[in-house]
C-alpha cells in the first residue's frame, strides 16, 4: 500500500453551480437531475493499491498488467464503486488521473486490467456478421463463455472473475476499507457500481449496463462498434436506464461518427445536445454528451481519441491539473432522477435477478 497525491495540485472551481437549481435546465417532462459539486473534496493523499491479477487468482494467466485501486479514507464516501476499464492494448496505469478524481469525489475506485487484445474495431468488420462479432466478443470478454473466434477468454480471465477476485482480495487484505460492500454472495453488487472505460473499455461498460442494472455508465471515446458509421443493434436495448449514461469524446476522433451514433442509440440525446466543456461550465445544461475540440497533448497512439482521459494525451492547465477535470467530476457526480442510494440486500437482490 502506498499513498499518492497523483500530481493534482488542486481542483478547478465551478462557476455555474447556480444552474443546478434551475429546473428549466432539466429534460422536459422529467424530474430534473441534480449536480453535486462536492466543493469540499479532500486534498489529502489517496490510498493506492497496485495488485497483480494473478495474486488474486492463480488461474488468471492473461493480461497480467497490474490492477489499480484507490480510495480517500479522509473524505466523504458515496458508497459506490467506480470500475474503469482501459482501451485496446492499454493498462490502468495510463489512466491514473481520472481514477484519482473518482476517488476524490467519494468513490472506491478500481482500474481493472483485462484481456483487451485484439481491437474489436480491427477484427469485427472482416467477420461475416460484424454486428454479432462485436456483441459476442464483448460478452465473452465479460463472462468468459466461448462465443467468438476472435477472442480467447475463459472464465478465470473474464472481467467478471477478475473484478470478483480483486474485490475479495482487497476485502481480505484491507478489511477496514469497505471493499466488501460491493460483493453480495461472492458476486459483484452491480447496482452499487459506476462502470466506465475508454474506447474498447467503454464499450464493455456499455455492454455490462446492457445486461445488468448499474448505478452509472461513463464512456470515454466510446462506444466505437459500428456498421459503416451506424450503431450496432446490441447498443439499442439495455437494462440500465438511458438517463444513467454519459459520454465524452473529441470531435476530431476518427471514430467520432460511430461513437455519436451509439450515444443516439442509447437515448442520450434526449437529455440535450452535446456541449463543449471548454466553452461552458458545470452542469453543462445537464447534457449527457460532452464533445471537445480542445487541442490534446501530443503523445503515443491517437491523441484526439485518447484525449478524453488518458494521462499521456489529456490536456493539462498551467498548474498541472487536467483541463477536463470539471467534465470528469460532472459525469461522476451529477445525479439522475431515479438514482438509487440504497446499499442493502434488497437492492442487490433486485439487481442480481437481472444478471445473466
For each feature predicted by the language model, list its residue ranges.
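C-terminal motif of bacterial Sec signal peptides marking the signal peptidase cleavage site
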Residues: 18-20
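N-terminal cap/lid segment of alpha/beta-hydrolase-fold proteins
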Residues: 29-76
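Short beta-strand element of the alpha/beta-hydrolase
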Residues: 79-87
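Short amphipathic alpha-helix adjacent to the substrate-entry channel of hydrolases
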Residues: 95-110
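Conserved alpha/beta-hydrolase
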Residues: 106-120
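Alpha/beta-hydrolase active-site loop
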Residues: 131-186
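Gly/Ala-rich beta-loop-alpha elbow adjacent to hydrolase catalytic centers
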Residues: 196-201, 205
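The feature captures the conserved acid-bearing segment of alpha/beta-hydrolase catalytic domains
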Residues: 215-313
Amino acid at each position: 500500500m502506498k499513498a499518492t497525491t497523483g500530481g493534482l495540485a488542486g481542483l478547478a472551481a465551478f462557476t455555474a453551480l447556480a444552474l443546478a437549481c434551475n429546473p428549466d435546465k432539466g429534460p422536459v417532462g422529467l424530474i430534473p437531475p441534480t449536480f453535486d459539486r462536492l466543493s469540499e473534496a479532500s486534498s489529502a493523499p489517496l490510498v493506492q493499491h497496485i495488485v497483480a491479477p494473478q495474486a488474486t487468482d492463480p488461474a488468471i494467466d492473461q493480461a497480467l498488467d497490474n490492477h489499480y485501486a484507490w480510495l480517500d479514507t479522509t473524505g466523504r464516501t458515496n458508497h459506490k464503486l467506480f470500475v474503469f476499464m482501459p482501451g485496446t492494448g492499454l493498462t490502468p496505469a495510463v489512466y491514473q488521473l481520472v481514477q484519482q478524481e473518482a476517488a476524490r469525489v467519494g468513490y472506491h475506485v478500481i482500474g481493472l486490467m483485462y484481456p483487451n487484445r485484439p481491437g474489436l474495431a480491427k477484427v469485427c468488420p472482416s467477420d461475416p456478421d460484424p454486428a454479432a462479432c462485436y456483441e459476442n466478443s464483448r460478452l465473452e470478454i465479460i463472462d468468459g463463455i466461448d462465443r467468438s473466434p476472435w477472442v480467447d477468454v475463459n472464465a478465470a480471465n473474464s472481467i467478471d472473475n477478475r473484478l470478483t477476485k480483486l474485490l475479495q482480495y482487497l476485502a481480505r487484505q484491507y478489511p477496514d476499507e469497505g471493499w466488501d460492500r460491493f460483493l453480495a454472495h461472492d458476486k459483484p453488487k452491480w447496482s452499487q457500481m459506476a462502470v466506465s472505460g475508454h474506447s474498447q473499455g467503454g464499450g464493455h461498460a456499455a455492454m455490462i449496463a446492457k445486461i445488468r442494472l448499474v448505478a452509472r455508465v461513463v464512456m470515454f471515446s466510446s462506444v466505437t462498434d459500428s456498421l459503416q458509421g451506424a450503431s450496432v443493434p446490441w447498443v439499442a436495448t439495455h437494462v440500465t436506464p438511458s438517463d444513467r449514461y454519459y459520454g465524452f469524446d473529441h470531435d476530431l476522433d476518427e471514430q467520432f461518427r460511430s461513437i455519436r451514433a451509439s450515444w443516439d442509440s442509447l437515448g442520450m440525446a434526449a437529455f440535450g445536445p452535446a456541449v463543449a466543456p471548454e466553452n461552458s461550465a458545470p452542469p453543462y445544461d445537464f447534457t449527457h454528451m460532452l464533445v471537445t475540440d480542445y487541442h490534446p497533448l501530443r503523445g503515443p497512439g491517437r491523441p484526439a481519441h485518447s484525449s478524453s482521459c488518458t494521462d499521456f494525451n489529456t490536456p493539462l492547465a498551467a498548474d498541472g491539473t487536467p483541463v477536463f477535470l470539471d467534465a470528469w467530476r460532472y459525469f461522476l457526480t451529477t445525479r439522475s432522477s431515479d438514482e438509487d442510494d440504497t446499499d442493502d440486500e434488497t437492492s442487490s437482490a433486485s439487481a442480481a435477478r437481472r444478471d445473466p
